[in-house]
Amino acid sequence: MVIILKKTLEKKGADDVIASRANLGPFQAQTMSQGAALFSCGLMETSRWHDSCSIRQRPVGTSLESLWDVLPEVHSGSAQWDWDVGSASSTLTSLLQDLSLTESSSHSTAPPSKKQCRSLSCSDELGGCRSTWRPQGSRVWTTVEKRRCHSGGSVQRSSGGNLQLGFPAMQRSFSFSLPARSNAVEPPSFTQRLPYAFTSLTHSSSMPLASDPPAQPLSLSNEQICFPEPHGPSPSSSPDSTPELERRSGQGGLARSRSQPCELNEKKIGVKRRRPDDTHKQRPSLDLAKMTQKLHSFHSLSCPGITGEETCESEATPPPRSVQQRDAVDSPAHEHNLKDFQPQEGDFNGNKSSDPITEEVDWNCDDGTPETSNGKDTEPLWVGLCSMKRDVYQLGGELDIEQIERN
């Protein structure tokens, strides 16, 4: 900052010497009046910059007013150029360059705000030639597309009828700003970015939106600009989730992904999908009477001499089995007899596997009955065969050789 101040002071002193020694002739007042811009440098009228950017008045000699003090008085009649055009043009261009430097760095003690820097760096003449600066995604600048669902580009127009009043809000939605002009002339750089439909609607003399007292939303986005028809949003959608439902209505509306909540208005969101009642099948209830009846019929068919009562009585008082009885059960003669009875075992096993509780009851009853039958020597041979058959049922219909060897 100190180096810039020293350089500007030196240039200012050199400009004063050049201005005092310059011998300029009479000059036409029309060509050098305080117009909107001088040459193509992008310098605009000082009063407009002061009005728009609210910059305080600087002393004479640091602004463009020193240029008019340097120039001599103007003849009232038709003036003619008496001085050399080349030297005068070079003097004027050097004055303009030095004045622009002093004007930008004169208030360097208090740095200008962000708005002033941005507005001074973009002029009307240069803005029309080059593309406007658009910030990319970073921590400070966020693109508009990320938050379009919540804030969007919608601007509530005022009912005064002047469309220029809505421009600052629109500039905020585009994340860039232009110098706010005191007059109602549209900035050319902003006009160049907008589609043709929006600019033609701006310059039209009679607009239907200006006469309506209620404010209507103006849809503003990078893809397309459309004025929605005035009908209220649907009651099922909240304004936070669906900013403008009308933006997607019509042929030229914006394309929106199907996962957005505005596309799912017909469906109920947040409600659990329950299965229909037809799919629930009642589980079969356990019929204990039928199970006991099956048990009695099974015992009567397998061993005709032993009924269900005898089986339960023998289960109540089981005598301890001796080693000789176990050896007699495990003899190969009994195994040979068991092979003869195996086709009937399959039939009874199929009946047993239908009910798990019946299997458990049969298992408990089978534990007691063979012990009593093998313990009595006076019983006939078929009682021992029946008891061996029940031992086979206890093993699941197949002979477990490892269990026999272990016994």
From Swiss-Prot:
Which gene specifies this protein's sequence?
A: fam53b
Which residue stretches belong to region Disordered? 204-286, 306-380
Tell me the tissue specificity.
Predominantly expressed in proliferating cells throughout embryonic development.
The job of this chain, per UniProt, is described as: Acts as a regulator of Wnt signaling pathway by regulating beta-catenin (ctnnb1) nuclear localization.
| Disulphide bonds in the chain | none
Record Pfam families: FAM53
Residue ranges of the motif Nuclear localization signal? 272-275
Q: Where is the composition biased (Basic and acidic residues)?
A: 264-281, 327-339
* Coarse class of the protein's main subcellular location: nucleus
InterPro entries on file: FAM53 (IPR029356)
Q: Which organism is it from?
A: Oryzias latipes
Localization per record:
Nucleus
Q: How does it assemble?
A: Interacts with ctnnb1.
What protein name is recorded for this chain? Protein FAM53B
Q: Which domain of life is it from?
A: Eukaryota
CC per GO annotation = nucleus
Compositionally biased residues, Acidic residues: 357-369
Keywords of the record, alphabetical order, are:
Nucleus, Wnt signaling pathway
- Please describe what happens when the gene is knocked out: Delayed epiboly and reduced embryonic size.
| Family to which the UniProt record says this protein belongs | Belongs to the FAM53 family.
Q: Name one GO biological process term.
A: regulation of canonical Wnt signaling pathway
